[in-house]
Every structure is written in structure tokens, then in C-alpha cells.
Amino acid sequence: FRLFRFLVSLSSLSLTLFISGCVQSGNVFVAPNKVVLADQTPNTHFEQEVMITRIGQVLLVGKMSNEERATLHFERGVLYDSLGLWGLARYDFTQALSLQPKMASVYNYLGLYLLLEEDYDSALETFNAVFELDPSYDYTHLNRGLNFYYVERYNLAEDDLMKFYEADTKDPYRVLWLYLNEQKLKPQEAHANLVERAKGLSKDFWGTNIVQYYLGN
């Protein structure tokens, strides 16, 4: 996939450039693992597997409303996703939507899977659905921006990535995604804009080092 190859090339600078995440939910995973690699920490895996088992037991025997059942499917889907079990995650997300059709966070995950499959039209429709349900869903600006980037609609990508950046101008990863798109859209201005935006970054964020790398420092 072009998206995968692109992220791998970035990982030569940082294995977690995508750590800013593509997913926004109550317990945001997960975001670092969505597109790159599932976490390899054994203790974390064990805890996640225990939670998956417990949720499965509750779903089998528990009496609950559709909303509660949808929430459990979503939470188990997030756990599967964090383990790299995307087929199982997708099943749970689909179940959640069948029970609770207005879960914006589920559409965001499904949109990411479609993006990875290079089904850009369907991914765009799914990300648009997120905004219809929750206009404040921040990370979908990144996801939809990436979708536009890969179909070379850089002007539309700029709109989304700029909104994503403006939501937190101290986040180096937001600065980087905006810069990468501007290299395509307005290459004469991209470097100067990166220099200016880098001034607002905190040295407390490791990702600031990646920005400095792009600046040649």
C-alpha cells in the first residue's frame, strides 16, 4: 500500500511518527498502533486479552440495552485493533453500528481501514459521516486530510490538516503532516512555514526532534 510504504519511510526517522494518532475516543488507544505495528509488550497484551475475554463473557450472558451492548462491542473492537487483529476489530465495530448507528468513533475506525485498503471514495464517505455525527471529532481532520493527500487533492487536504494543526499548534506531528502536504501543494512556501511553526513547539515533545531533522538541524 502507498500509505504503508509512506509510513515505513517515515519510520526510519521515528518508529512512531504516527504516534499523534488517527483515532480519537475516550481512551485513545491505540492511536500509535493503528497504522504502524501492534504493541509488543507482553504484559500489555495479557491485560488486553483478559479484557477481551471478560467483555465476551458479558456479551454472552449479560442483559443490557442496545446502547450498552454497542459500547461493549466498540471497546472490544478497540482492544482487537490495538493487538493488530483488524478483522476481529472490524467485526465488532460493525456489530456496534448495527446496534447504535450514530457512533462517530466507529465510523472513524472503519474509515481508517478503508483508507488502508486504498478505497478512497468509501473512506471519504465514512469520514464525512463522522463529521455529520460529531463536527468536533478532531482526528478525523487528519484522517480525511490523508485521504485527500493520497488522491492528490492537496488543496482539500490542506483545509483538513490546517484545522488539525490549529487544534493543537504545539503538537509536532500535526506540524509535520501539514508540512508534508504543503510540499506537494506549495513547495516554495513549505519550508518557511515549517520554520515558523516550529517556533511554537515544545522541546518536551520527542517529535520536535523530527521537525528539527526536517529543518536540517
Give the location of each predicted region.
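Structural marker of alpha-solenoid helical repeat scaffolds
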Residues: 61, 65, 99, 133, ...
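Helix-start (N-cap) detector for alpha-helical repeat units in TPR-like alpha-solenoids
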Residues: 66, 70, 104-105, 138-139, ...
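Canonical tetratricopeptide repeat
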Residues: 75, 108-109, 143, 177
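Residue-level recognition of tetratricopeptide repeat
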Residues: 78, 112, 146, 179-182
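Register position in tetratricopeptide repeats
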Residues: 82, 116-117, 150-151, 184
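N-terminal leader/linker segments that initiate helical-solenoid repeat arrays
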Residues: 22-75
